[in-house]
Regions:
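C-terminal subdomains that position terminal phosphate/3'-OH groups for nucleotidyl transfer/ligation
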Residues: 171-233
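Sequence-structural signature of the catalytic-core scaffold of metal-dependent phosphohydrolases
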Residues: 2-191, 200
Length: 233
């Protein structure tokens, strides 16, 4: 819920601000572990999302009580905060749970049959297959919607938008319909819907073509990394 700016603000509070004192002072006299301190000084929204979804509160046992399959699909980065980016694989780009949620995270991953990919005491797994689709949906919609906002705010010209989006919509655009749309907002909304549709179809194609590798934990890319529209994204 904090966005990337919020992540940086929280991280800076603990690494440079008043939160720095918590590294040494704990109510029970114990110091935070290296991993716990990393969770605070490199705060990660994906890990916080997992905590929000699963946190037990008075009268609310198990948080939102989502199915393990839903939580598995949510877990884009199924590893702890350290080591940082141990490989170039997309699943190792960030981390997906705080130390306080480690036991439950491992329980979900184990129950879903997610493939362990770390050695020693490090905790990490290959992605749940559906996490690739969740990531693609997130990337596709936000990228195009942010672009649409830029156009509607006058930061991007309509002509440039059409030039940018044409490779995404050229196979599906109805030019006669497009010409009947009277306002810029309607025209851009039409292009946005077509563009997202093209990206969805391509993501599905990449997923199906690589399903075997994905199921076996051998697909270290995002779906959009392999998309024919990667340049546009």
């Amino acid at each position: 819920p904090f966005g990337h700016s919020g992540e940086r603000a929280i991280s800076t509070f603990f690494s440079e601000g008043k939160g720095l004192r918590l590294k040494e002072i704990q109510p029970d006299g114990e110091q935070l572990s290296t991993m716990e301190w990393e969770d605070l000084t490199h705060f990660e929204g994906n890990a916080n999302g997992f905590a929000v979804l699963t946190a037990t509160r008075p009268g609310n046992e198990g948080g939102l009580r989502m199915s393990y399959a839903t939580l598995g699909a949510f877990m884009k980065y199924p590893k702890e905060s350290l080591p940082k980016k141990p490989t170039a694989a997309i699943a190792d780009k960030k981390y997906g749970f705080f130390q306080t949620d480690k036991a439950f995270f491992q329980d979900v991953a184990s129950d879903m049959g997610m493939i362990p990919n770390k050695s020693g005491n490090d905790i990490g797994f290959e992605r749940h297959p559906l996490a690739y689709l969740v990531e693609a949906a997130d990337d596709n919609c936000y990228t195009i919607s942010d672009f649409e906002d830029g156009i509607n705010l006058g930061l991007v010209s309509e002509d440039f938008a059409l030039e940018y989006l044409i490779k995404l919509v050229k196979d599906s655009i109805d030019t006669s319909k497009y010409k009947t749309l009277e306002t810029k907002e309607d025209r851009i909304s039409y292009l946005r819907a077509l563009a997202i549709g093209s990206l969805i179809n391509d993501a599905v194609k990449v997923f199906v073509e690589n399903e075997g590798a994905i199921l076996n934990g051998k697909f270290p890319y995002s779906l959009m990394d392999m998309s024919k529209y990667k340049v546009q994204m």
